[in-house]
From Swiss-Prot:
Family named by the database record: Belongs to the universal ribosomal protein uL15 family.
GO biological process terms on file: translation
Pfam short name (any one): Ribosomal_L27A
Coiled coil stretches, renumbered: none
Protein name, per record: Large ribosomal subunit protein uL15
SUPFAM superfamilies: Ribosomal proteins L15p and L18e
């Protein structure tokens, strides 16, 4: 067997449908499009969501939600991630260097997901009540 002798398995390939080539083909005259109407014409399709002039669903329903402009500037760090950090003093710069928050991040908040078993000092970061309690229970502290 060689690459130039490879062929698809028998019956794996279907012949292209040749429409509009006489009544003997079974797909002559109307070529599978039926009789008259917009969809039988060339170029005769309406845009997606068009409901024949009726107010479309996406315009009938109210707008909802918004895109926060500050989302990319606020980071979120888990307690479990702080456990893996090689430093004892955690601040925004340490988080950026460790890759836990993005370069554009201007502030970060610690959330109580995971466990913290070692003592750390947190500087200039926010924390949830649960995260603050877990850090202080492990012997850590917050320096503002």
């Amino acid at each position: 067997m060689e690459l130039n002798n490879l062929k698809p398995a028998e019956g794996a390939k279907h012949a292209k449908r040749r429409v509009g080539r006489g009544i003997g083909s079974g797909l002559g005259k109307t070529a599978g499009r039926g009789h008259k109407g917009q969809k039988s014409r060339s170029g005769g399709f309406h845009k997606v969501g068009f409901e024949g002039g009726q107010m479309p669903l996406q315009r009938r329903l109210p707008k909802r939600g918004f895109t926060s402009l500050t989302k990319e500037f606020v980071g979120e760090v888990r307690l479990g991630d702080l456990e893996k950090l090689p430093v004892d003093e955690v601040d925004l710069l340490a988080l950026k260097q460790a890759g836990l928050v993005g370069e554009l991040t201007k502030s970060a908040k610690i959330i109580a997901t995971g466990e913290l078993k070692r003592k750390i000092v947190v500087k200039g970061l926010g924390a949830t009540k649960g995260a603050r309690a877990a850090i202080e229970a492990a012997g850590g502290s917050f320096a503002e």
